[in-house]
From Swiss-Prot:
A GO biological-process term: ribosomal small subunit assembly
Era-type G domain sequence ranges: 2-169
Record region (G2): 36-40
Lineage: Bacteria, Pseudomonadati, Spirochaetota, Spirochaetia, Spirochaetales
Spans annotated as G4: 119-122
Domain of life per record: Bacteria
Name used for this protein in its record: GTPase Era
Assembly, per entry: Monomer.
Membrane-topology descriptor: Peripheral membrane protein
SMART domains, alphabetized: AAA
Residues that coordinate or bind GTP: 10-17, 57-61, 119-122
A molecular function (GO) term: ribosomal small subunit binding
C-alpha cells in the first residue's frame, strides 16, 4: 500500500482547487475564476485499494510585496516542504512568464519530485506550444508532464496513476471514509465566502472574510449564524444588494451546499459586519490563513 502528502501549486486561477475537488470527489476547496480565492492550505484525502493520497491545495502563486500576498506565499512555501510530491498546475491558456520561472526554480531547488499538469485542455484557444517550449527549455522531462481537464474529468484517472507511481509504501494516515481534515466551522465559513465571491464576481475578493458565530446541532437540523466581514462601509451595500436581494441570494445558495455536505437541513442566518481596514491587520491576516 502506498501513501503520501502531495502539494498542488501554481499561479492564481489555473484550476488547482478544481483538480483537488475532482480527484477527491467532493467540494473541499473553493473554486472561482477570481484570483487567489484559496487562502489556507486545504487538505483533501483520496483513498482507494492502492493506498491514500493527502493533497494540500495552496493559494495561487503571485509575486507581490503586499502583506496579504506575502502571508499567502508563506503558506505555499510551507506546503512544498511538507510534501513528497508536488503537482505544478499550468493553465493551458496562459503565456509562461516570470511567475512560471519562479515556481519552477523553487520546485527544482527543493529537490522534491514533481509532476507538471497542463490543465484546461478542453479549451480551444491555447498557449500549448509556448508552454511545451518553456518546459523543454527548463529541461523538464516529458514523462513528468500530463495534460488534463480537471473540470471535464479528462485524464484524471491517469493523473491518479501517475501520483501513485511517485509515492512510497506507507500507512493510511486517515480513516478510509475521510475526504478532508477541515473542521466543520472552517468548511462552512469557506462555503459562505466562496458563494459570496461567486455572486460578487471580482468586486471584493480580498476585502471579505467570514466567521461562524453560532453552530448548533438542533435535533433535525443545524442552526448557523455567520458574519460576512468587510473592510469598508461601501462594501456592505454591495453584499446586501438592493432590497436585501444580494445577501438573500448568498444565503440561499450557501444553505443548499451546506445541507448537502452536512447531510442535514440547516437554518442559516447571515449578517454583514464592518471591521474597518481589517485587511491591513497583520495579526488578523496571519490567523485567517493559518
Amino acid at each position: 500500500m502506498k501513501s503520501g502528502f502531495v502539494s498542488i501549486i501554481g499561479r492564481p486561477s489555473t484550476g488547482k482547487s478544481t483538480l483537488l475537488n475532482s480527484i477527491c470527489g467532493h467540494q473541499i476547496s473553493i473554486t472561482s475564476s477570481t484570483p487567489q480565492t484559496t487562502r489556507n492550505k486545504i487538505k483533501g484525502i483520496f483513498t482507494d485499494k492502492r493506498g491514500q493520497i493527502i493533497f494540500i491545495d495552496t493559494p495561487g502563486f503571485h509575486l507581490s510585496k503586499k502583506n496579504f500576498n506575502i502571508a499567502l506565499m508563506n503558506n505555499v512555501y510551507s506546503a512544498i516542504i511538507e510534501t513528497e510530491l508536488i503537482i505544478y498546475v499550468i493553465d493551458i491558456q496562459d503565456q509562461p512568464g516570470t511567475e512560471e520561472n519562479e515556481i519552477l526554480t523553487i520546485i527544482q531547488r527543493s529537490k522534491i519530485n514533481f509532476i507538471v499538469a497542463i490543465n484546461k485542455i478542453d479549451i480551444h484557444k491555447t498557449k500549448e506550444k509556448e508552454i511545451m517550449t518553456f518546459l523543454e527549455e527548463k529541461k523538464i522531462q516529458k514523462n513528468k508532464i500530463i495534460k488534463i481537464s480537471a473540470e471535464k474529468q479528462i485524464n484524471i484517472e491517469t493523473m491518479k496513476d501517475k501520483i501513485y507511481e511517485n509515492l512510497n509504501e506507507g500507512p493510511l494516515y486517515y480513516p478510509k471514509e475521510y475526504y478532508t481534515d477541515q473542521k466543520i466551522n472552517l468548511r462552512i465559513s469557506e462555503i459562505i465566502r466562496g458563494v459570496t465571491i461567486k455572486k460578487l464576481k471580482e468586486e471584493l475578493p480580498y476585502s471579505i472574510y467570514t466567521e461562524i458565530e453560532i453552530l448548533e446541532d438542533r435535533e433535525n437540523k443545524f442552526f448557523i449564524k455567520a458574519n460576512i466581514i468587510v473592510a469598508g462601509e461601501s462594501q456592505k451595500g454591495i453584499i446586501v444588494g438592493k432590497g436585501g436581494k444580494g445577501i438573500k441570494s448568498i444565503g440561499e445558495e450557501s444553505r443548499k451546499i451546506i445541507s448537502k455536505i452536512l447531510e442535514k437541513k440547516c437554518n442559516l442566518f447571515l449578517q454583514v459586519k464592518l471591521r474597518k481596514n481589517w485587511n491591513k491587520n497583520a495579526k488578523l491576516i496571519k490567523n485567517l490563513i493559518n
